[in-house]
């Protein structure tokens, strides 16, 4: 017997459509101004660190696609009780990572790449577990790409180094605002 669900089909179509349109206009439906500013700074950091505009664009585009898809899944009530617990755990880990990043940015000589990288890897693993049955292997690859990129100890060390002070300041300002507003 074939099981058919129009809700499932509609959700699949919505995710497919949004993945094709993961540009700025669709992102504004799910990503506010502060988040957009942080993403712009992360793009600049990635571009300067990798010396590759296409690579920086790809990682931010993957991040936006994943964020939009997870938002659609959450908005449509696709997560069961155990998955909602995972979503809460992911949010807590992300919040912990943001507070750690802020602390490292505000207190001189406290930065440890391994600590921040470890938190990002934990976030990646929880998110992968959360979306395991909802997103395709291609989307799982996007999640790995984004978190592996930003948890690179070399990138993190550069971000907290003297050449990226301006970018780090703007990222910290955005993270602080998002934490204050309860968006992280």
Swiss-Prot record:
InterPro entries: TNFAIP8-like, TNFAIP8_sf. Keywords: Cytoplasm, Immunity, Innate immunity, Lysosome, Nucleus, Phosphoprotein, Ubl conjugation. This is Tumor necrosis factor alpha-induced protein 8-like protein 2. It comes from the Eukaryota. Acts as a negative regulator of innate and adaptive immunity by maintaining immune homeostasis. Plays a regulatory role in the Toll-like signaling pathway by determining the strength of LPS-induced signaling and gene expression. Inhibits TCR-mediated T-cell activation and negatively regulate T-cell function to prevent hyperresponsiveness. Also inhibits autolysosome formation via negatively modulating MTOR activation by interacting with RAC1 and promoting the disassociation of the RAC1-MTOR complex. Belongs to the TNFAIP8 family. TNFAIP8L2 subfamily. Phosphorylated by TAK1/MAP3K7; this phosphorylation triggers association with BTRC and subsequent ubiquitination and degradation. Ubiquitinated in a BTRC-depdent manner; leading to degradation mediated through the proteasome pathway. GO terms for biological process: innate immune response; negative regulation of inflammatory response; negative regulation of T cell activation; regulation of apoptotic process; T cell activation. The modification Phosphoserine is found at residue 3.
């Amino acid at each position: 017997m074939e099981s058919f669900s129009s809700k499932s089909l509609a959700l699949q179509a919505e995710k497919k459509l949004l993945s094709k349109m993961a540009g700025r206009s669709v992102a504004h439906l799910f990503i506010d101004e502060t988040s957009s500013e942080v993403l712009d700074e992360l793009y600049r950091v990635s571009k300067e660190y990798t010396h590759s505009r296409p690579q920086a664009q790809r990682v931010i585009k993957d991040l936006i696609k994943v964020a939009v898809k997870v938002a659609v899944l959450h908005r449509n009530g696709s997560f069961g009780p155990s998955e909602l617990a995972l979503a809460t755990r992911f949010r807590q880990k992300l919040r912990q990572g943001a507070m750690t990043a802020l602390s490292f940015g505000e207190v001189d000589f406290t930065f440890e790449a391994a600590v921040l990288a470890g938190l990002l890897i934990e976030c990646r693993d929880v998110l992968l577990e959360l979306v395991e049955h909802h997103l395709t292997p291609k989307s799982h690859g996007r999640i790995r790409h984004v978190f592996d990129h930003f948890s690179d100890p070399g990138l993190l060390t550069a971000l907290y180094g003297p050449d990226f002070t301006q970018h780090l300041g703007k990222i910290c300002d955005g993270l602080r605002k998002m934490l204050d507003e309860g968006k992280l």
